[in-house]
Amino acid sequence: MEKQTVAVLGPGSWGTALSQVLNDNGHEVRIWGNLPEQINEINTHHTNKHYFKDVVLDENIIAYTDLAETLKDVDAILFVVPTKVTRLVAQQVAQTLDHKVIIMHASKGLEPDSHKRLSTILEEEIPEHLRSDIVVVSGPSHAEETIVRDLTLITAASKDLQTAQYVQELFSNHYFRLYTNTDVIGVETAGALKNIIAVGAGALHGLGFGDNAKAAIIARGLAEITRLGVALGASPLTYSGLSGVGDLIVTGTSIHSRNWRAGDALGRGESLADIEANMGMVIEGISTTRAAYELAQELGVYMPITQAIYQVIYHGTNIKDAIYDIMNNEFKAENEWS
């Protein structure tokens, strides 16, 4: 692939890691953010110490606060901003962009009030004459591992296969490999909903439960994620792939996962306010829990784990009581769909 110019919107942990992947592949990378101190640190010291204390970035990676300068003559734009501001940033891009580009996003969540997927938001806010079909970049990936060039395999999903293949080639190298998929709904819902299950898995650890319980929540969590995804139009096969069970395993079992760590702290009795203050990073699983719960209620989809976590987070239900309620639900067959 010829050298491409890519704007990465969002200098968080994952945006920074993906910027390095693109730079390693010989592309021009421009990171955009709205914190002058952070942007200056990236350009002056080639570090982003809030996320990576010991990592030095290539000096070819340039950061900007000016969106127009960032987007000038770019070939592709990668959104890696928190879910709650995706629409706002997309509106700013639509007002600034003056040519057609490939639009990608690598964030995982649902818009809190509308319950919409992020690709839908980007489609709504960025006119068709300025963009390709949206490409979702998602899968089992800790930024802490990708930034040190550990092996990572994820998915590029788009309704248009050729556009997904462009992104596959854009990112893939000897340590970072992408597979294509045309099931955007499946890949996107898997990436968003696994954060909820990761909060639950972390809570079980914080409460002192063993591996049996942790395996159960991942397996049963995958079942309810699949039920909701299929109700929205996804293929059930997607959830057995990298963006489904793969991402759920890596997020639901690792201390690298901020959603798992948040759940672990909840299980140990910390308040949600203290957890969010101490974490210093967005915990997408918290807001996604409400969106998924309300969406499941609207569609009549059975999601007992999501419901339990929703009750704990938003109504102050005791975690042990929530677990007791799940364990005393009506008996069901394992493959029952409701």
From Swiss-Prot:
Compartments, as annotated in UniProt: Cytoplasm
Domain of life: Bacteria
EC number: 1.1.1.94
One annotated Gene Ontology cellular component of this protein: cytosol
Stretches that traverse the bilayer: none
GO molecular function per UniProt: glycerol-3-phosphate dehydrogenase [NAD(P)+] activity; NAD binding
Coiled-coil spans in chain: none
Pathway participation: Membrane lipid metabolism; glycerophospholipid metabolism
Binding-site residues for sn-glycerol 3-phosphate, renumbered to this chain: K108, G139, S141, K194, D247, S257, R258, N259
UniProt keyword Transferase present: no
Cited InterPro entries: 6-PGluconate_DH-like_C_sf, 6PGD_dom2, G3P_DH_NAD-dep, G3P_DH_NAD-dep_C, G3P_DH_NAD-dep_N, NAD(P)-bd_dom_sf
Disulfide bond positions: none
Record-annotated active site: K194 (proton acceptor)
Similarity-based family: Belongs to the NAD-dependent glycerol-3-phosphate dehydrogenase family.
Protein's recorded name: Glycerol-3-phosphate dehydrogenase [NAD(P)+]
Lineage, uppermost ranks: Bacteria, Bacillati, Bacillota, Bacilli, Lactobacillales
Gene expressing this chain: gpsA
